[in-house]
């Protein structure tokens, strides 16, 4: 909640895999009092994932917006239309996606798959806050520059009190 407030985030969506633990995640969200704009459940099957992400991010409409704007400019009297058209032809999409941040409640390869699908649909962590669960120990996520910046929750040391560590060695 503090992160949302500090960063002016008003439309946070949750992306939750459609797995047996989805209800636990939903309960935890409710208990945490995180302000949620929408919750989307997705199938982690890679053959279905990208289509689902395209729908969530309004990708087909944003892609069509580029074509429509080029057509509008071609038929206009705008003196700079060639330059504007050339700039539009470099873009994959234009338009709003409807959220300012997303929390991806997934791990490992599934997390990488959904992040890759988001980037494919022209949703960048440079414009939208990508937040995930405690995956800071996964160095491959940290090394992949297209995923950056990606945010991870942490505990408030003052509120947590003493922490006991155990080892099974």
Language-model features and meaning:
Residues 101-119:
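Hydrophobic alpha-helical
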């Amino acid at each position: 909640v503090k992160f949302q407030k500090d960063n002016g985030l008003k439309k946070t969506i949750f992306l939750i895999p459609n797995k047996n633990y989805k209800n636990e995640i939903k309960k935890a969200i409710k208990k945490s009092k995180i302000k949620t704009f929408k919750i989307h459940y997705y199938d982690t099957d890679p053959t279905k994932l990208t289509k689902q992400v395209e729908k969530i991010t309004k990708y087909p409409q944003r892609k069509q917006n580029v074509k429509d704007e080029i057509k509008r400019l071609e038929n206009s009297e705008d003196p700079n239309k060639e330059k504007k058209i050339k700039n539009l032809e470099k873009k994959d999409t234009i338009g709003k996606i409807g959220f300012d941040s997303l929390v991806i409640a997934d791990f490992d390869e599934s997390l990488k798959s959904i992040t890759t699908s988001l980037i494919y649909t022209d949703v960048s962590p440079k414009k939208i806050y990508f937040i995930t669960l405690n995956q800071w120990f996964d160095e491959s996520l940290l090394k992949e520059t297209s995923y950056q910046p990606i945010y991870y929750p942490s505990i408030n040391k003052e509120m947590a009190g003493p922490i006991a560590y155990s080892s099974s060695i």
